[in-house]
């Protein structure tokens, strides 16, 4: 069975917290957990550790899920607003994971924040706020994307678009990192998917394929998952 690691979201203690909430909590949103396990894959949550290289040796692939902002400090900027300071602890850990799995030749798939993290890990930067792509509707917020002609996603899906996706974010890729190519854009030009140009599998989408299951008109998230798992089994 294919063994996939997923980096956790982190819930940090807040002022006035009591009980278990005085501790750092590691968690996974159920939607992405069930999506990954809908195929023949065994999922492992990877708690904070300095053993990223050991995780990379033991597992077949890595998934980076959504969650908190990337700290602008990670790409050499100051937060434009205090609430956009992000989670530097998670940033540093996930950057280590991306580098370890890539060095081991293991595939990496980024979802939402994961796409931004991969871009930053490889030397890119982010727009700190894209208000038009943010919504309180969460998994009901959708827009169209166009797949880049000749891209891996265009080959995977057999067309370039437009196709609807669930996409909720207020940060987005600004300066594309070396070693990445654009795979899809929103109608306003915002980068919505990237892929590594090297020999290993590295793909990331700004949208949430785990929310697409069975919804008419939405890009099939299963095809992307199958591509990632095929790379993990190679």
Task: List each model region and its residues.
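N-terminal beta1-alpha1 cap of cysteine-dependent amidohydrolase-like domains
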Residues: 1-107, 120, 127, 131-157, ...
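Gly/Ala-rich beta-loop-alpha elbow adjacent to hydrolase catalytic centers
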Residues: 110, 114, 119, 123
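Active-site-proximal beta-strand elements of phosphoester/diester hydrolases
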Residues: 202-206
């Amino acid at each position: 069975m294919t063994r996939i690691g997923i980096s956790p979201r982190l819930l940090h203690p807040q002022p006035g917290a009591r009980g278990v909430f005085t501790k750092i909590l590691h968690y996974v949103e159920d939607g992405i957990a069930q999506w990954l396990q809908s195929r023949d894959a065994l999922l492992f949550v990877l708690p904070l550790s300095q053993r990223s290289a050991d995780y990379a040796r033991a597992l077949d692939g890595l998934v980076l899920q959504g969650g908190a902002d990337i700290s602008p400090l990670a790409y050499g900027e100051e937060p434009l607003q205090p609430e956009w300071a992000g989670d530097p602890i998670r940033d540093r850990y996930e950057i280590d994971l991306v580098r370890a799995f890539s060095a081991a030749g293991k595939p990496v798939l980024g979802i939402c924040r994961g796409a931004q993290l991969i871009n930053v890990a490889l030397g890119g930067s982010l727009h700190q706020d894209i208000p038009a792509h943010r919504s309180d509707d969460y998994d009901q917020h959708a827009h169209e994307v166009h797949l880049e002609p000749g891209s891996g996603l265009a080959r995977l899906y057999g067309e370039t678009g437009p196709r609807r996706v669930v996409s909720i974010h207020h940060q987005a890729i600004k300066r594309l990192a070396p070693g990445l190519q654009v795979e899809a854009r929103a109608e306003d030009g915002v980068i919505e998917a990237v892929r590594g140009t090297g020999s290993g599998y590295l793909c990331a989408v700004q949208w949430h394929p785990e929310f697409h299951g069975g919804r008419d008109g939405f890009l099939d998230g299963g095809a992307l998952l199958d591509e990632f798992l095929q790379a993990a089994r190679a």
